[in-house]
């Protein structure tokens, strides 16, 4: 193989080209690559942080959902207890009212019975006096009549 001037000239030109590239072309390319690498690393870090934040948010939402369900169950249980209590109170009030109405009706019946008995006594007394007058054939005066009625009423 012959080394001639063309090969040396091409080698010198190539060396100048390499030095030129190392001096002027290579630094901006390296800077651009480093910036791109930094952006990619920052993006990956941001994605990791976002994934962690999402995980924490999902845990927090799950916890809040469990708490809300527990609160809802507690409210429902309290409502059921309150409803049962209201039913018991209404039942007790109805029983008390029924007892009161029953006692009032019983008192009215007693009062009516007594007034009917008194009226019946008076009628029986009048009938007895009328019958006695017919039997005796004479009239009895008012005072004697009242006295007889009272005696009969007391006996009846």
Swiss-Prot record:
UniProt-listed InterPro entries: ATP_synth_B-like_membr_sf (IPR028987), ATP_synth_b/b'su_bac/chlpt (IPR002146), ATP_synth_F0_bsu_bac (IPR005864), ATP_synthase_B_chain (IPR050059)
Membrane topology: Single-pass membrane protein
Subcellular location: Cell inner membrane
One Pfam family linked to the record: ATP-synt_B
Keywords carried by this UniProt record: ATP synthesis, Cell inner membrane, Cell membrane, CF(0), Hydrogen ion transport, Ion transport, Membrane, Transmembrane, Transmembrane helix, Transport
Recorded GO MF terms: proton-transporting ATP synthase activity, rotational mechanism; proton-transporting ATPase activity, rotational mechanism
Subunit structure: F-type ATPases have 2 components, F(1) - the catalytic core - and F(0) - the membrane proton channel. F(1) has five subunits: alpha(3), beta(3), gamma(1), delta(1), epsilon(1). F(0) has three main subunits: a(1), b(2) and c(10-14). The alpha and beta chains form an alternating ring which encloses part of the gamma chain. F(1) is attached to F(0) by a central stalk formed by the gamma and epsilon chains, while a peripheral stalk is formed by the delta and b chains.
Function recorded in the entry: F(1)F(0) ATP synthase produces ATP from ADP in the presence of a proton or sodium gradient. F-type ATPases consist of two structural domains, F(1) containing the extramembraneous catalytic core and F(0) containing the membrane proton channel, linked together by a central stalk and a peripheral stalk. During catalysis, ATP synthesis in the catalytic domain of F(1) is coupled via a rotary mechanism of the central stalk subunits to proton translocation.
Family note: Belongs to the ATPase B chain family.
Name by which UniProt lists this protein: ATP synthase subunit b
Organism, as annotated: Pseudomonas entomophila (strain L48)
Lineage: Bacteria, Pseudomonadati, Pseudomonadota, Gammaproteobacteria, Pseudomonadales
Gene designation: atpF
């Amino acid at each position: 193989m012959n080394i001639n001037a063309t090969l040396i000239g091409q080698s010198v030109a190539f060396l100048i080209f390499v030095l030129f590239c190392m001096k002027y072309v290579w630094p901006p390319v390296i800077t651009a690559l480093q910036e791109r690498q930094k952006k990619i690393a920052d993006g990956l870090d941001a994605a990791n942080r976002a994934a962690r934040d999402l995980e924490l948010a999902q845990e927090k939402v799950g916890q809040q959902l469990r708490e809300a369900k527990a609160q809802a169950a507690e409210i429902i249980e309290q409502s059921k207890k309150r409803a049962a209590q209201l039913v018991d109170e209404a039942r007790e009030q109805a029983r008390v009212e029924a007892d009161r109405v029953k006692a009032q009706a019983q008192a009215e019946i007693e009062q009516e019975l007594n007034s009917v008995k008194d009226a019946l006594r008076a009628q029986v007394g009048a009938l007895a006096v009328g019958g006695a007058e017919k039997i005796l054939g004479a009239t009895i005066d008012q005072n004697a009549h009242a006295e007889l009625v009272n005696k009969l009423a007391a006996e009846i």
